[in-house]
UniProtKB/Swiss-Prot annotation:
The active site is at H44 (proton acceptor), E71 (proton acceptor), H193 (proton donor). Pfam families: PdxJ (PF03740). This is Pyridoxine 5'-phosphate synthase. Pathway: Cofactor biosynthesis; pyridoxine 5'-phosphate biosynthesis; pyridoxine 5'-phosphate from D-erythrose 4-phosphate: step 5/5. It catalyses: 3-amino-2-oxopropyl phosphate + 1-deoxy-D-xylulose 5-phosphate = pyridoxine 5'-phosphate + phosphate + 2 H2O + H(+). It comes from Elusimicrobium minutum (strain Pei191). Its EC number is 2.6.99.2. The gene is pdxJ. 1-deoxy-D-xylulose 5-phosphate binds at D10, H11, R46, H51, T101. Belongs to the PNP synthase family. NCBIfam families: pdxJ, PRK05265.1-3, PRK05265.1-5. The record marks E153 as: Transition state stabilizer. One of its GO terms (molecular function) is pyridoxine 5'-phosphate synthase activity. It is found in: Cytoplasm. Homooctamer; tetramer of dimers.
C-alpha cells in the first residue's frame, strides 16, 4: 500500500500572524504542496483563530475542492463552518484553551460520544467525510467506529516524544495493533502528530497505514530548503520501505 501524505500548513499562517501581516498566504503554500504530490492539505481552525482564519478555509475550499482536510473541535460553531465551506473531510480533535498544540486524542466518554456522533451524522449528510483523532488503543478504535466516522487518525505524539528506543517500540506496537483493528473494522487509518523526517519511516511501514498528516517538520525544514523541496523529501520518506 502506498502511504499518502497530508501536509498541514497551519504554521505558514503562524508566520503570518507573527507580524500581523497578510502574507505568507496559506493558499500559496497549498498550491506548492499539492504541486509536489501531497494528497491533501490539512488546516486546523482553532477557536482562538491563532493562525488559520475563517477566510483561509473559504479560500482553500473554493480553490481546491476535494483537497482540504479541516481539523477542528467538536462544537456547533465549527460544524456550521464546515457545513458552509464543505471541505473534503473534517477531523474532530480535542481542543483546550492555552495549549500550544493538540496533546492527545479525543475523550470518547458518554457525553462526548453523543455530541461527536451527532456532528458526524450532520457532516456526512452533506457529503463530508469524518475523521476522529484518537489515542492508539483498541477501545478507542471501537468507540470511533460506533460514532459512524469513516476515518481514524491515530495520535503519534507519544511515539514521537518517546525518550528511549524501548518506549518508542512499545508506542509503535500500539499504533500497529490499532491500525490493524481499524482496517478490520472498515475504517480508513491515518496517523499524525510530531512526526518528522527522522521518525516517520517506521510509522509509514505499518501494514494498515493509509495516510500520514505532517506539518511542523515540513514547514520548519522549508525555512532552509524551500517548501517544495521539504515536501518532496517527506514524500520520499513516507514511501521508504525497510
Amino acid at each position: 500500500m502506498t502511504v499518502k501524505l497530508g501536509v498541514n500548513i497551519d504554521h505558514v499562517a503562524t508566520l503570518r500572524s507573527a507580524r500581523g501581516a497578510d502574507f505568507p498566504d496559506p493558499l500559496t503554500a497549498a498550491k506548492v504542496c499539492l504541486g509536489m504530490g501531497a494528497e491533501f492539505i490539512v488546516v486546523h481552525l482553532r477557536g482562538d483563530r491563532r493562525h488559520i482564519k475563517d477566510k483561509d478555509i473559504e479560500n482553500l475550499c473554493k480553490t481546491y475542492p476535494g483537497k482540504i482536510h479541516l481539523e477542528c473541535a467538536a462544537t456547533k460553531e465549527m460544524q456550521d463552518i464546515a457545513l458552509k465551506y464543505k471541505p473534503a473531510s473534517v477531523c474532530l480533535v480535542p481542543e483546550f484553551k492555552g495549549e500550544l498544540t493538540t496533546r492527545g486524542g479525543l475523550n470518547l466518554n458518554k457525553k462526548n460520544f453523543e455530541n461527536i456522533s451527532k456532528i458526524t451524522t450532520n457532516l456526512q449528510a452533506k457529503g463530508i467525510k469524518v475523521s476522529l483523532f484518537i489515542n492508539p488503543a483498541a477501545e478507542e478504535v471501537r468507540l470511533a467506529k460506533k460514532t459512524g466516522a469513516q476515518i481514524i487518525e491515530l495520535c503519534t505524539g507519544p511515539y514521537s516524544e518517546a525518550k528511549t528506543k524501548k518506549q518508542q517500540y512499545k508506542e509503535l506496537e500500539d499504533l500497529a495493533m490499532s491500525s490493524i483493528l481499524g482496517a478490520e473494522l472498515g475504517l480508513e487509518v491515518h496517523s499524525g502528530h510530531g512526526l518528522n523526517y527522522e521518525n516517520v519511516v517506521p510509522v509509514a511501514n505499518l501494514e494498515a497505514m493509509e495516510c500520514l498528516n505532517i506539518g511542523f517538520a515540513i514547514i520548519a525544514k522549508s525555512v532552509f530548503t524551500g517548501l517544495a523541496a521539504a515536501v518532496m523529501e517527506m514524500q520520499e520518506a513516507v514511501k521508504e520501505r525497510y
